């Protein structure tokens, strides 16, 4: 006897989950992206890494991009004292320009507007210069250390493994000058929550340990500052060889990062300069910001949107699923460079 197959329609119920969050009491929260691009992927409610902070489903960029474009490892390399025109298209920087052609370039990226070096480094991790500039005091000289939330504070609170690598630092957490090392190029040293604790020696180390840490894949945020010979800072007199020096260093060290599993598995490398040269005939504040990632939107991608060192901090926070500091709450995010 033939068996009859009886079919019926079963309705499918779709549930829309909307998670909302407001600013937290410490001045951090989840901002809206002024670029209007953070929610374009339509995945702001995804299960990204930012869920633990309570912002993964928010309408702002720290939730949307933190979930949909979250980077597993973020690398940051900061060079010294060259404006945009001194690097982009320069014959003195062939390797760096090859990176620009293959990855992404922010063509309207600015330093903090406060000089010399130190205020720019501090802005990159705290969203503010922290003092009026005009000099580069040591980490233990007034008005430092300062008590202010910063990226190090956030990474520790979120239990995200990280380190700051300083070429030629020698002794970990070194607070004094030692040619060719300068503590003013390690901004994490200038905050009370780092300088006065055992974290200082654990997190601020000589660049010599970077290769082993990179191979181990332990850390999700890795800040790198080349020494005073390699960072591109021009000598006081001609010939000005800084761009050649930084390009030579980059040509040796950056390929090691690009060959690593940490980079290949969703990594993002930000290569930038602390401040513009400021000499006659040069831009006062415009500097290169090169975004390098296997997930770059397209080879040679460029954006003329107005970005700055504050945007860098906001972007790192978004990619790692961290709530934004109040100092960068309304800053645009550079996640448009990523797929």
Where are these regions (language model features)?
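Ser/Thr-rich, Pro/Gly/Ala-heavy low-complexity intrinsically disordered linkers and tails
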Residues: 16-67
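Sec-dependent bacterial lipoprotein signal peptides
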Residues: 1-19
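N-terminal pro-sequences and low-complexity stem/linker regions of secreted or lumenal proteins
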Residues: 22, 33-36, 63-339
């Amino acid at each position: 006897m033939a068996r009859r197959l009886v079919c019926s329609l079963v309705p499918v119920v779709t549930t829309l989950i909307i998670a909302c969050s407001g600013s937290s009491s410490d001045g951090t929260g989840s901002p809206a992206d002024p670029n209007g691009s953070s929610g374009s992927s339509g995945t702001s409610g995804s299960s990204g890494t930012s869920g633990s902070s309570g912002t993964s489903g928010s309408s702002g960029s720290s939730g949307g991009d933190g979930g949909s474009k979250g980077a597993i490892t973020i690398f940051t390399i900061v060079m010294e004292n060259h404006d945009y025109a001194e690097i982009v298209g320069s014959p003195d920087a062939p390797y760096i320009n090859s990176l620009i052609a293959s990855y992404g370039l922010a063509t309207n990226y600015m330093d903090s507007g406060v000089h010399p070096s130190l205020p720019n480094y501090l802005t990159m991790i705290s969203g503010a210069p922290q003092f009026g500039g005009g000099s580069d005091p040591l980490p233990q000289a007034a008005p430092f250390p300062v008590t202010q939330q910063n990226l190090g504070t956030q990474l520790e609170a979120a239990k995200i493994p990280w380190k700051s690598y300083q070429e030629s630092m020698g002794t970990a957490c070194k607070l004094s000058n030692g040619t060719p090392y300068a503590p003013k190029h390690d901004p994490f040293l200038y905050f009370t929550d780092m300088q006065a604790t055992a974290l200082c020696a654990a997190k601020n180390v000589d660049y010599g340990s970077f290769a082993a840490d990179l191979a181990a894949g332990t850390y999700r945020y890795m800040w790198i500052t080349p020494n005073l010979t390699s960072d591109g800072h021009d000598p006081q007199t001609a010939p000005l060889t800084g761009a050649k020096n930084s390009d030579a260093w980059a040509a040796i060290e950056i390929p090691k990062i690009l060959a690593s599993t940490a980079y290949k598995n969703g990594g993002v490398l930000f290569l930038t300069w602390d401040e513009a040269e400021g000499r006659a005939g040069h831009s006062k504040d415009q500097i290169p910001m090169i975004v390098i990632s296997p997930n770059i939107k397209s080879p040679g991608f460029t954006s003329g949107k107005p970005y700055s060192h504050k945007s860098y901090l906001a972007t790192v926070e978004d990619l790692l699923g961290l709530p934004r500091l109040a100092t960068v709450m309304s800053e645009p995010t550079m996640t448009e460079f990523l797929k």
